[in-house]
């Protein structure tokens, strides 16, 4: 008998599905069939686990013609351990995890030896985690009070939120001394979980803030340079995301299944979105200098064109496959995880900020860009080719949005109007931080992200957004120019 058939036989014996026929043949019964006038059960071979046949057809028989195979209490306990050992040795980690979960919370003590043996052999991190929890739960039924208290401490140290309820419910069935330890460990674990949840809220705020900063950096450059409220900036993000999707489709055609497409798509997302930004400036905005209302309406029209074009080409919903390196996350505790994809976005934003700061403050292009932002006419008189600076700035702003779109494929679907979710918040970041101010953009973006995620656990998302907008309005009443006041042409006008 092979291992799979042996494991199935043990489970059948444990569940009372092994019987004898009138001729004394040992069989395993399947589910009852009530389609006829009386119930019948199919029979299986206990050795091979395959269906038995009689006359070339599946053998079915009335349950009344079968006799039970008696299994005593001690034998049933041995069967539980043996069955658990078979289930816990399954080659599939997901099956092993499911097997452990089936023993929780009340069956762990009956199969504790099998759980301990499985823990000593387990290599998979996820399965080891739940095995440790199951062993600690099983040891709560230890024969001595010392063993029970030690198990409670280990259970609390593992950090699983379900242990709080478990310890408090078990406190009523033990001695007062042990119950005191149970309650103390439950309170200790609850406080730890609350603290870790606050850390997770801060992390979520930093993650949202990083996305807003990544989108708003390009918007701040364009708005600070040309004074244009670019309503198509969210669509630059969408262009970067769809470029990633196209690269994935091309790779799946010639090299299916790999993750290299994601990294290859990075420069193409930046270049494509940057070129769309240059095209927008050349075709539309250069004709509308110092006409802010017309510029706003024109960019809004361009955004509608880009959205409908994407919808016509790709449909309403597409998705980009997440690279295997970004699956899972860093576990602060059993119930608190920091996803790798969002950690990557935070790191990406930090790197992008460093590169942008270098471009703006350590290169001739940055010097000319800042000069044009401060005073376009004087810069032109000094020989700066302002039209060329405009093109490069729009390429940089669009490229940063394309970079954000590339990163956004890690945390959401790719849809034609995906930029709408961030364009308003990005404008809030730019205005609150100060027009064209990189440091202000970072502070405002992170602040808005943290406040948004901090309000969500207390208020609903909609009410949290209303409160956030109210706070920004009050702040702008005190500092109309934002955290850092702009200088140059924007201030003069």
PLM segments and residue spans:
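Extended repeat-based scaffolds of very large eukaryotic assembly and lipid-transport proteins
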Residues: 1-165, 169-197
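Inter-helical junctions in multi-pass inner-membrane proteins, predominant
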Residues: 201, 338, 359-360, 364, ...
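Single transmembrane alpha-helix segments in multi-pass membrane proteins
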Residues: 202-246, 279, 283-293, 432-435
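Membrane-embedded helix boundary and interhelical linker motif in transport proteins
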Residues: 233-279, 458
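Pore- or pathway-lining transmembrane helices of multi-pass membrane proteins that form conduits
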Residues: 235-239, 288-311, 349, 418-431, ...
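Alpha-helical transmembrane segments within multi-pass membrane transporters and channels
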Residues: 257-303, 309, 443-448, 479-480
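Cytosolic-side transmembrane-helix boundaries in multi-pass membrane proteins
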Residues: 313, 324-325, 374, 381, ...
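Helix-loop-helix "hairpin" substructures at the membrane interface of multi-pass membrane proteins
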Residues: 336-414, 443
């Amino acid at each position: 008998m092979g291992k799979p058939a042996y494991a199935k036989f043990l489970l059948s014996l444990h569940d009372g599905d092994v019987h004898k026929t009138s001729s004394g043949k040992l069989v395993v019964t399947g589910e009852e069939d009530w389609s006829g006038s009386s119930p019948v059960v199919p029979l299986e071979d206990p050795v091979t686990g395959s269906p038995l046949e009689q006359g070339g057809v599946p053998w079915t028989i009335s349950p009344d013609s079968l006799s039970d195979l008696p299994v005593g209490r001690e034998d049933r306990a041995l069967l539980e351990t043996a069955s658990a050992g078979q289930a816990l040795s399954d080659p599939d980690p997901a099956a092993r995890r499911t097997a452990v979960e089936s023993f929780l919370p009340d069956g762990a003590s009956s199969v504790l030896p099998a759980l301990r043996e499985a823990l000593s052999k387990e290599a998979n991190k996820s399965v080891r985690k739940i095995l440790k929890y199951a062993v600690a739960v099983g040891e709560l039924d230890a024969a001595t009070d010392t063993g029970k208290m030690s198990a409670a401490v280990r259970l609390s140290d593992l950090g699983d939120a379900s242990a709080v309820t478990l310890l408090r419910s078990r406190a009523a069935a033990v001695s007062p001394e042990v119950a005191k330890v149970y309650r103390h460990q439950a309170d200790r674990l609850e406080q730890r979980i609350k603290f870790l949840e606050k850390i997770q809220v801060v992390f979520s705020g930093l993650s949202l803030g990083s996305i807003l900063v990544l989108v708003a950096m390009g918007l701040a450059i364009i708005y600070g340079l040309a004074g244009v409220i670019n309503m198509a900036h969210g669509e630059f993000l969408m262009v970067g995301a769809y470029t990633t999707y196209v690269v994935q489709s091309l790779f799946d055609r010639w090299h299916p299944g790999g993750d290299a497409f994601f990294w290859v798509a990075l420069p193409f997302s930046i270049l494509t979105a940057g070129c769309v930004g240059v095209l927008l400036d050349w075709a539309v905005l250069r004709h509308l200098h110092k006409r802010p209302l017309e510029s706003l309406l024109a960019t809004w029209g361009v955004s509608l064109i880009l959205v409908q074009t994407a919808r016509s080409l790709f449909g309403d919903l597409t998705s980009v496959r997440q690279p295997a390196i970004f699956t899972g996350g860093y576990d602060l505790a059993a119930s608190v995880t920091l996803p790798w994809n969002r950690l990557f976005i935070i790191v990406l934003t930090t790197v992008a900020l460093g590169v942008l700061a270098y471009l703006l403050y350590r290169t001739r292009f940055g010097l000319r860009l800042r000069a044009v932002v401060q005073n376009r006419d004087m810069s032109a008189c000094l020989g700066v080719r302002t039209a060329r600076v405009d093109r490069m700035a729009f390429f940089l702003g669009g490229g940063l949005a394309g970079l954000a779109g590339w990163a956004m494929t890690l945390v959401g679907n790719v849809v034609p109007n995906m930029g709408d979710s961030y364009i308003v918040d990005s404008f809030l970041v730019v205005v609150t931080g100060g027009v064209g101010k990189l440091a202000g953009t970072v502070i405002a973006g992170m602040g808005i992200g943290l406040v948004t995620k901090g309000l969500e656990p207390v208020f609903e998302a909609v009410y949290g957004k209303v409160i956030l907008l109210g706070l920004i309005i009050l702040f702008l009443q005190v500092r109309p120019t934002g955290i850092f006041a702009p200088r140059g042409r924007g201030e003069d006008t």
